[in-house]
Amino acid sequence: MNDNPIRCFVAFDFSPEAKAFIHSIIEKNQTRLPQARWVQPNQIHVTLQFFAALLPTQVNQVKLIIQNFFPLIESFPSTLAEIGAFSSWNRARVIWLGFDHRSGEIMKQATQVFNEECTKQGIAVDRTRPFSPHLTLARLKNPVSILPQQLFQPTCYTTSIRQVSFYQSTLTPRGPIYSPLITIPLKEVK
């Protein structure tokens, strides 16, 4: 790593089986919303915190926070529930997949504590928007008005969240490339 700031983010990862299920939802919706830029299977994750520009020393600090904090969190079941849109169905820019209440609360709590640890270490975190647990399925360049019933709504699917990763995000003309800087397993539930 050189001294240039890097784009990076912390995210919960999914198992290959869960990614395959999520990708099947994307495939069923691509023809229903062809103007959207759909997420590739290898980029499926839940972003807990995005950092637009961290210096290498800050990257190392974040790695240490992740190594010290996330192994204390127990792996947890998470049910993928419904499809939604940001900012609204009338002005959709992001199509997302939401979670059951319990796992959403675990994600919110983990993000809050992680952000507090970063702040204590002098690392600025984005607090302009409250954390809303979701998995991005697609992005739209221009907002569109769509009805929820226009999209394939999946049946509920339960998986386990077992690890967190810290990714570098490199922007390219073909889309972002995510490179894991560190991956840490959550505490295994016995």
Regions found by a protein language model. Give the residues of each.
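Histidine-dependent nucleotide/RNA phosphoesterase domain, centered on the 2H-phosphoesterase fold
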Residues: M1-K190
